[in-house]
Design a protein with these regions (language model features):
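Active-site neighborhoods and metal-handling regions in enzymes and metal-associated proteins
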Residues: 1-180
Length: 180
């Protein structure tokens, strides 16, 4: 059984990961602007994680490669605009000294969305499709939108991954991507 405080923290990390991963924004935005999407669930509870929320992933999966990333604090030279095709990690976490640490990471592909009179809208597509542990989720601290994001993410995981699995593996994946 997962202790309640760990469930609550895991749930906050999941909410944070999904809020950023579902972000929509106008072309010209930087990771500095969008980082608040991931940190808000923590900051609302006077919590934080002391690392950047994400970083670029480069050619041949080189890690921690610029030019873009997500962080709340300005650093000189890290103001690159997010562009179509950029892959950036979404990896919020929480670390309680002497107790536990939790981090969830997805890689996000930056995509163009609607172009209208307001400009070019952009969005992210999760390209790391792994279920989040539902046994560690506390649905009582999630609002309806949080639950919808999790259910939509899990439906996408099942839809895209299950065609590559045998029947037994599909049953396992179905159980771990069920709606809450």
């Amino acid at each position: 059984e997962v202790p309640q405080i760990m469930k609550d923290h895991f749930t906050l990390v999941a909410i944070s990961n999904l809020q950023l991963g579902n972000g929509k924004f106008l072309e010209g935005a930087t990771g500095l602007i969008l980082d608040i999407l991931a940190r808000k669930p923590f900051w609302d509870r006077d919590l934080n994680f002391n690392h950047g929320t994400g970083h670029g992933v480069g050619y041949l999966l080189n890690i921690h490669e610029g030019p873009a990333g997500f962080r709340w604090k300005y650093r000189k030279g890290e103001t690159e605009v997010l562009q179509e095709g950029m892959v950036i990690t979404d990896e919020p976490g929480i670390y309680i000294e002497g107790s536990h640490g939790i981090r969830l990471e997805n890689e996000l592909l930056t995509c163009k969305g609607t172009l209208n009179e307001y400009g070019q809208f952009m969005y992210f597509e999760a390209i790391t499709l792994i279920p989040m542990d539902l046994d560690a989720i506390n649905p009582d601290i999630m609002n309806a939108e949080d639950k919808e994001r999790l259910n939509t993410y899990h439906a996408t995981v099942y839809e895209k991954v299950s065609p590559y699995l045998n029947d037994e593996e599909k049953e396992w994946l179905k159980k771990y991507t069920r709606a809450i």
